[in-house]
UniProtKB/Swiss-Prot annotation:
UniProt main location, coarse: periplasm
Transmembrane segments: none
Keyword Signal: yes
Protein name listed in UniProt: UPF0194 membrane protein YbhG
Coiled-coil annotated residue ranges, if any: 140-209
Paired cysteines (S-S): none
Keyword Coiled coil on entry: yes
Keywords recorded for this protein, A-Z: Coiled coil, Periplasm, Signal
HAMAP family for this protein: UPF0194
Compartments in which it is found: Periplasm
Family: Belongs to the UPF0194 family.
Length: 331
């Protein structure tokens, strides 16, 4: 009876060892995932928002750039002239608007009333003359042409009187609301043109948008540039990413936010630290540029890993070994 018991215990021990070994192997596999990727540093094409002649560039390729640094300037003269013209336009529009609001002075109203009296007298004379000419024409003393001339003079005097009366009425009642609104709109338009002229002048100075290293200097002083033409290319200091790819079998290990260790050939014993920032929802074939021992025909998912302790030693395209293990979680 003892022999079967011993055999049973041995079998149970063997099963336990196999199960434990399987669990240990799988856990080590989960914690020991290794991927291969490349450093991915963003670049910015820097340009002027306005066009003109390039007057100066203050930086060269390889220079370290600080955010807010003046990189270059366009010729200011055309934009300074446009600014002066815009300021004058605002002054004219403001004066016209103020005049509309103020209405007319007593002296102007008196002059308009005098003009009405003068026009009235001229009309009365023309009307009386026309009446006399009508009587003479009936008695065949004058020609029809003379009568027509008298009628034309009367009509012209009447039109002059109507114009003078309308002007006097406007002076007494003040400007119409529509005219005041139009003057105000013209003033606002002039102010907008002034603001645009100020912005254009400001944009003749090229300012660095972020910290980085200057990669390329595309043009030289004296060049005529269109708005938006690339002048400089800047490699941003931050953020630094690593782009890697994972197959579907290991996709469950790449949750966003997971800590990662990143090894480079230059410092194999001192890893960088990172966190998974993005996992592509779409599978793709492994790009040819990726260094991986797996088959390149496999469908994989792209990862973007944020390097949390990046330094200047990490350069665009540098190969990186990506380690998923417990060390990354505790360091």
């Amino acid at each position: 009876m003892k022999k079967p018991v011993v055999i049973g215990l041995v079998i149970a021990a063997i099963v336990a060892v196999i199960a434990g070994g399987t669990w240990w192997y799988q856990s080590r596999q989960d914690d020991g995932l290794t991927l291969y990727g490349n450093v991915d540093i963003r670049t910015v094409n820097i340009s002027f928002r306005v066009g003109g002649r390039l007057a100066s560039l203050n930086v060269d390729e390889g220079d370290t750039i600080k955010a807010g640094q003046v990189l270059g300037e366009l010729d200011h003269a055309p934009y300074e002239n446009a600014l002066m013209q815009a300021k004058a336009g605002v002054s004219v529009a403001q004066a016209q608007y103020d005049l509309m609001l103020a209405g007319y002075r007593d002296e102007e109203i008196a002059q308009a009333a005098a003009a009405v009296r003068q026009a009235q007298a001229a009309y009365d004379y023309a009307q009386n003359f026309y009446n006399r000419q009508q009587g003479l024409w009936k008695s065949r003393t004058i020609s029809a042409n003379d009568l027509e001339n008298a009628r034309s003079s009367r009509d012209q005097a009447q039109a002059t009187l109507k114009s003078a009366q309308d002007k006097l009425s406007q002076y007494r009642t003040g400007n119409r609301e529509q005219d005041i609104a139009q003057a105000k709109a013209s003033l606002e338009q002039a102010k907008a043109q002034l603001a645009q002229a100020q912005l254009d002048l400001q944009d003749t100075t090229l300012i660095a948008p972020a910290n980085g290293t200057l990669l390329t200097r595309a043009v030289e002083p004296g060049s005529m540039l269109n708005a938006g033409s690339t002048v400089l290319t800047l490699s941003l200091t931050r953020p630094v990413w690593v782009r890697a790819y994972v197959d579907e079998r290991n996709l469950s290990q790449t949750q966003p936010g997971r800590d990662i260790l990143l090894y480079t050939d230059g410092r194999p014993d001192k890893p960088y630290h990172g966190k998974i920032g993005f996992v592509s929802p779409t599978a793709e074939f492994t790009p040819k540029t990726v260094e991986t021992p797996d088959l390149r025909t496999d469908l994989v998912y792209r990862l973007r890993i944020i390097v949390t302790d990046a330094d200047d030693a990490l350069r665009q395209g540098m190969p990186v070994t990506v380690k998923f293990n417990d060390e990354a979680r505790h360091e």
